[in-house]
Amino acid sequence: MSAEGYQYRALYDYKKEREEDIDLHLGDILTVNKGSLVALGFSDGQEARPEEIGWLNGYNETTGERGDFPGTYVEYIGRKKISPPTPKPRPPRPLPVAPGSSKTEADVEQQALTLPDLAEQLAPPDIAPPLLIKLVEAIEKKGLECSTLYRTQSSSNLAELRQLLDCDTASVDLEMIDVHVLADAFKRYLLDLPNPVIPAAVYSEMISLAQEVQSSEEYIQLLKKLIRSPSIPHQYWLTLQYLLKHFFKLSQTSSKNLLNARVLSEIFSPMLFRFSAASSDNTENLIKVIEILISTEWNERQPAPALPPKPPKPTTVANNGMNNNMSLQDAEWYWGDISREEVNEKLRDTADGTFLVRDASTKMHGDYTLTLRKGGNNKLIKIFHRDGKYGFSDPLTFNSVVELINHYRNESLAQYNPKLDVKLLYPVSKYQQDQVVKEDNIEAVGKKLHEYNTQFQEKSREYDRLYEEYTRTSQEIQMKRTAIEAFNETIKIFEEQCQTQERYSKEYIEKFKREGNEKEIQRIMHNYDKLKSRISEIIDSRRRLEEDLKKQAAEYREIDKRMNSIKPDLIQLRKTRDQYLMWLTQKGVRQKKLNEWLGNENTEDQYSLVEDDEDLPHHDEKTWNVGSSNRNKAENLLRGKRDGTFLVRESSKQGCYACSVVVDGEVKHCVINKTATGYGFAEPYNLYSSLKELVLHYQHTSLVQHNDSLNVTLAYPVYAQQRR
């Protein structure tokens, strides 16, 4: 059975420093089991940022080693099903010529390819095929400043070049061979590979980028991403990297060898792409791809970044005068189960050293996330919990989250990560929030609620409209790309017909000239002209469609930008509206009045509440408070009940309660926090003085504002129907 995992590619060489580490070589492919990251408390999406994870434990597919490696030394490739390896089929191998038979150069040209696939030529720690490395080193040593390099053909024939390539890499001496022969052997090597260095699978995407993206900077970034994609096997990627470094080195001395990026791309793009496999109409676009790859310095290796720290275990935790025995729930900087968006809002425009702690998004018991402001950005640091100890990384040494935070309020986090040279200076206090509601009377607050709700609805409608346009445009772009491919095939068919007709027309025209049959000659010429005209029409239609596609692709990106710019406003408006609504609810404003300010007429809306009813069964706590019942008993009590049926029980989490409610026919559970400010499902909503007050509020207010999967109200106490 296969398991899910993630693949990474090594960007730098790393020599292991500890027994549990593994060596890395540039281009190595590594696999990490998803379960190992989940066990450490990382959520979906974080695997794409290995530098934030720190040290990963995985398997080096290139060397066969298993162990720890630094996340700062690798890049994320994508997901992968991990299963037992299957033997890779060998490429076709040519039959040897029978002894005594003679072969001409033409015979050699027709011979099947002699070189093995790139995947079979590389073995760690090679950064490219050994034969290719030897050729390039010899060429750079002899001909780096040669003005005729790669442009003058040597006197060697094809058979001699292939004989050179067939030699044993270790024994062959290239010192005495002319540089032009080496250059021709280099070209022949690229042509004799079973598959081009740049696989045909990425041709169409490269061409689409060249046609659709107008910004050169954006084009380079997208091209980099495509070149590093899993579509290019890592042996091919390493070879391409090596070739680009060679071409870049040649272009650096173009004043002497006359080989600038453009000239090199014109010479080698047919060999790297194999134009016979691509449309000749796209030749210029493919040349442009190679020119950009050579011209930009993205392929040059940067110095390796700092290793993620493995801090030594502290001998003792200094007593800093703070209360390490304080409950986490009472800590002003602990916000419980709030979203990342809310955290970003609270830390917006704050000073370096501002911080807060929330529950980890993985919901694993005991794991938390510290969000710290550093360098104008939010840094997310996982707080791990194992065997009663807490910490940022192994070994875990602190007895509580409070003790951990207090330690780093006096000590720099550079102990943990050299890039985080800052202390936890300014806690974002849940007790000293900015007063959002500035007005001092109910009527004024109600008017502001109406204003914010109107703005929120307008923004929501705008976002929905953009989303529909985004989806429609995406579908149209795909249809146009398909149509362009169909045009290309149609043009190819018509051109073949045109060539066939042209070939046979010459014979018939000569025949009819001898016979003096002018009418038949005119008919043949007329048919030929009609065919050429039809080809021109199709080419014009394709050109217009390509122009439309380019414009629509630009619109598509603009829509995406606008949607992303609206999201923060939408979140902030909803948050502000909810705070005004909560203020009014706490002041005892009746629901009918709230509905007027919210403009609600549909009673099914989450804010359109039923009329206040003094006879609600919710007033009797015995109808819903079941005391110390556990999760299984709660599910048995609620099984088969209608949506909105609920109960409240004591939670396994010390000092808290749990609410169990039926949603879409299933029983869901959520924690009710008990804090110094009151009961609630999450900050800043822990404001209800009793469980009864909380239940009465959510009798008419949906839980969806706290959890998207809980679109339900606490409508029916579990024992209410039995008591009627």
From Swiss-Prot:
Sequence ranges of Pro residues compositional bias: 84-97
Q: Does the keyword Phosphoprotein apply?
A: yes
Q: Which GO terms describe its biological process?
A: cellular response to insulin stimulus; insulin receptor signaling pathway; intracellular glucose homeostasis; negative regulation of apoptotic process; phosphatidylinositol phosphate biosynthetic process; positive regulation of endoplasmic reticulum unfolded protein response; positive regulation of protein import into nucleus; positive regulation of RNA splicing
GO CC: one term? phosphatidylinositol 3-kinase complex
Under the subunit heading, UniProt states: Heterodimer of a regulatory subunit PIK3R1 and a p110 catalytic subunit (PIK3CA, PIK3CB or PIK3CD). Interacts (via SH2 domains) with CCDC88A/GIV (tyrosine-phosphorylated form); the interaction enables recruitment of PIK3R1 to the EGFR receptor, enhancing PI3K activity and cell migration. Interacts with phosphorylated LAT, LAX1, TRAT1 and LIME1 upon TCR and/or BCR activation. Interacts with CBLB. The SH2 domains interact with the YTHM motif of phosphorylated INSR in vitro. Also interacts with tyrosine-phosphorylated IGF1R in vitro. Interacts with CD28 and CD3Z upon T-cell activation.
Where does this protein come from, organism-wise? Pongo abelii
Where in this chain does the record put each SH3 domain? 3-79
Annotated protein name in UniProt: Phosphatidylinositol 3-kinase regulatory subunit alpha
What does its UniProt record remark on the domains? The SH3 domain mediates the binding to CBLB.
Domain SH2 per the UniProt entry, residue ranges: 333-428, 624-718
Q: Which residues carry this modification: Phosphotyrosine?
A: Y467, Y580
